[in-house]
Amino acid sequence: METVAMKQVYRFKVALKHRRRLWRRIEIEGAQTLGDLDRTIREAFKHDLWDHLSEFFWGRVWKSKGLGEIYPGGGGSGAKKRIDSLGLSEGDRMEYVYDFGDDIQHIVTLEKVIEAEEVAKHTRIISQNKPKYSYCEVCEKLGKKMVATWVCIECSNETQRDVLVCEDCLMKEHDDHYAEEMLY
């Protein structure tokens, strides 16, 4: 009788440290690396993939031992560390910082280690928070309810409040402004 080698899959809940209602649940094989987890977190939270350093920490960001910098292209001293070599147990927590300048911090909690014969595409985002949508302020003035998908940074800086707009209104009224996509 042939035995099937079981693969370990690590299930993490990753939340923005200062907006914990924004979270993603991510599964990754133990044989994959912190570089792979970094890329999935960047994709899940709409962080850019081509710029900015990141790093995982055993405790609080900047106050505890870091696991090595990860460069956007996947290099760096922390990028090749395998998930299954970290000695993690269910409930363990790390912190992750994306962009050392803007200091966007995340809480990374290991929820479960699963033994799996067949492993789906990994890494993968398996769930996320229920979105609490905001609406486009231009459309609201016209009596329409359109979900805002962009923050006009230029207008927000001028008015000292978030100026939230949908895709259409961004193109019509803010096309030459710097804007950032919203995260729900």
Predicted regions and their residues:
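Short linear regulatory motifs enriched in tryptophan with gly/pro/ser
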Residues: 1-184
